[in-house]
């Protein structure tokens, strides 16, 4: 599970903390792009690699079943953290859904040598996603444009992977 913070140590940034997200040691926001551990493991020979989200339980269940039959396997599951992210207690699933629907957390899997990017409709914007959490309260319009550019760059990279491995 990935909550993009070291919550037990006061919400320090991790390698997977999203760009511009405020952490306890970087109140102005993390400047580096996150590491994409699933892609690293895919290139390292894992038989099954996927991303998932608590907002899409049927997809998560399907991926867990697929991972159990292919070892080594890795699933990176987005799990929002209320203290680190700063959202209302009852909105964890909604925040997770916004991450997926805005493109900040793409869903994909690598199985049997095929990379498959899931086609999730973009019903939310990066601005919607950022507005759902206090860790992004400091962002300016320019910052939001940078986040949107990050999503575009990520979409482009993953699209090339899908075309290259599966086309």
Which residue ranges define each predicted feature?
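Conserved thiamine diphosphate
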Residues: 1-67, 73, 81
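Short acidic/glycine-rich loop or secondary-structure boundary segments that cap or lie
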Residues: 7-8, 58-60, 82-86
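Noncatalytic linker/hinge segments flanking ATPase motor cores
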Residues: 9-20, 37-43, 90-94, 113-123
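Short, surface-exposed, charged loop/turn segments at secondary-structure junctions
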Residues: 12-18, 57, 65-70, 86-98
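Short, conserved beta-strand edge motifs with alternating hydrophobic and charged residues
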Residues: 49-52, 74-78
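Active-site lining segments that contact anionic ligands and/or coordinate catalytic metals
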Residues: 70-74, 105
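Flexible, low-complexity linker and terminal segments
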Residues: 81-167
């Amino acid at each position: 599970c990935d909550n993009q913070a070291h919550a037990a140590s006061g919400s320090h940034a991790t390698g997977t903390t999203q760009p511009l997200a405020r952490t306890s040691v970087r109140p102005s926001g993390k400047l580096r792009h996150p590491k994409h551990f699933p892609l690293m493991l895919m290139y390292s020979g894992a038989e099954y690699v996927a991303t998932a989200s608590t907002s899409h339980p049927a997809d998560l269940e399907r991926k867990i079943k697929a991972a159990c039959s292919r070892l080594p396997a890795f699933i990176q599951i987005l799990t929002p953290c209320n203290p680190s992210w700063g959202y209302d207690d009852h909105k964890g699933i909604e925040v997770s859904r916004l991450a997926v629907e805005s493109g900040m957390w793409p869903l994909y899997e690598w199985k049997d040598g095929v990379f498959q990017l899931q086609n999730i409709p973009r019903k939310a914007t990066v601005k919607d996603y950022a507005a759902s959490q206090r860790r992004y309260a400091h962002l300016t319009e320019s910052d939001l444009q940078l986040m949107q550019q990050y999503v575009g760059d990520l979409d482009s990279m993953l699209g090339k992977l899908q075309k290259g491995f599966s086309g």
